[in-house]
């Protein structure tokens, strides 16, 4: 997925570097809010079960795109990060039977 985003951005000459990292992080936070809004709409603010909608999928995709664009911009290997966090969660489950942090 990360390479797909990189190829798309490069082929369309989408320049992300001029945007400061903090702006990119705020954009990701904004996308999270839009995803939450689609969840609320789908559940009628918690009064019914969640139904996956096209709008929810699009907002989820926006978050993935934004995260992977940030990873490319910062030369972060997203798959390696995922492997590290899965190992962290496995270790927590093995040691304390809970994935949550102790902070």
Residues covered by each model-derived region:
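Flexible "arm" and connector segments at domain edges
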Residues: 1-60, 64-103
């Amino acid at each position: 997925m990360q390479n797909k985003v990189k190829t798309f951005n490069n082929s369309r000459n989408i320049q992300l570097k001029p945007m400061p990292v903090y702006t990119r992080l705020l954009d990701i936070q904004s996308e999270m809010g839009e995803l939450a809004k689609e969840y609320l709409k789908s559940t009628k603010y918690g009064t019914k079960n969640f139904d996956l909608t096209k709008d929810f999928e699009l907002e989820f995709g926006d978050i993935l795109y934004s995260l992977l664009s940030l990873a490319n911009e910062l030369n972060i290997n997203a798959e390696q990060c995922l492997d590290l966090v899965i190992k962290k969660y496995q270790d927590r489950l093995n040691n304390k039977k809970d994935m949550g942090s102790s902070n």
